[in-house]
Structure formats: C-alpha cells, structure tokens
Amino acid sequence: MSKVVVLNDKLEKAGELDLPSKYAEVNPHNLYLYVKSYLASLRANTAHTKGRSDVSGGGKKPWRQKGRGGARAGSTRTNVWVGGAVAFGPTNERNYFQKVNKKQKRLALERALADKAAKGVLFTADSLAIESGKTKDANAVIKKLGVKDALIVKDLLDEKTLLAYRNLANCYVVDVTEVNAYLVSVFNAVIMEKSALESITKEG
C-alpha cells in the first residue's frame, strides 16, 4: 500500500499515512492521457505557412501550354516553385486542444499521487506556511527534506508563502484547488498540508 510520510513541526518524519488502496490500482494510461492533453494546451500555435490562396502573385500563366519543350505551368506560385506556396504546411488555425473527461483528470491525479507515495516522496505536514515571507526560510524546508525539487501544496495559499517560494527555481507552490497530475508528476517530491491532502482524498 502507498504510504504518505507524515512530518512534524520540525519537518522530521513522525509517522506514515495510508493512501486509499484504489489510487495505486488506477490505470497509468489515464495519467498519460492527462499529461499529453496538458502539454498540448501549452502549445503556442505560432507556426504558419501560406497556401495557394494566401500567396500574392502568380495569376499570369508563365508561358504557353505547348510548344516550348518544357514542363507545363499555370502559375509561378505553386509549391514546386521558389517563392511559391507551401503544400499542407502548418497554419495558426490549428487547435491543439485534447479533451480529457473530469473523471479521467481525477484518476490521473490519484495515480500520480500513488506513484509519489510508492517512491516515498509524498510528504504531509500540518502547516507549510512561511510567515516571514523570506526565501531563505522556504529554501530551508527543501534542504531539510533533502529533495532535489518539490511541489508545495497549500490548503489556502497566502501571499507571504507565495513570495517566499517564488524565487526558488526548484520549487513551485500552489493552492490545493490548482494541483493537477502534471504538476505532481514533474516534481521529484510533493509536500502537502494535511488539510489539503484530506480534501483531495475526500473527493475521491
């Protein structure tokens, strides 16, 4: 069964909690589909080429149809000509959206949490607030746990905690309402407030 590492006020291991057993039983394909959809939604869609109807010029037939001994041509703007159109090229009208059902999103998050718990890098503590708002205090949390990088999940994200973690390249802090399977997967460790973890497991 997947275990969540419980931390005390000094961020030392104080025990373990069990994640619902069904989390580890979720088909990992749900996680794959969600991450694929999430990354697709980030695409900027800037690649754009001009087709036959978009390029200027080429209205006049360059030479007569027969009698020259060369290949026939009706326009200087076909895709085989230099300066001509592009055949089947990308346009900025393409929509990269990939639909993922609400249930699949939920299952993906459950699987992502189960994977982190199985590796022993899913932590929970009563409070993760940085009341000083200082980056050095936030950095001390990560150093104490000895992890490369971490996703910090707060039940109610306050401004001082956000400011404290914002300058750390190896950390990202989110409110529990914004956490998703991609964020959980991309970080080496996940540290959640106990109330945030309870709200997620209660929904499932």
Curated annotation (Swiss-Prot):
Residues 49-75 are annotated as: Disordered. InterPro entries: Ribosomal_uL4, Ribosomal_uL4-like, Ribosomal_uL4_dom_sf. GO terms for molecular function: rRNA binding; structural constituent of ribosome. Gene3D superfamilies: 3.40.1370.10. The keyword RNA-binding applies. Keywords: Ribonucleoprotein, Ribosomal protein, RNA-binding, rRNA-binding. Belongs to the universal ribosomal protein uL4 family. NCBIfam families: rplD_bact. Part of the 50S ribosomal subunit. PANTHER family: 50S RIBOSOMAL PROTEIN L4, LARGE RIBOSOMAL SUBUNIT PROTEIN UL4M. This is Large ribosomal subunit protein uL4. It comes from Campylobacter jejuni (strain RM1221).
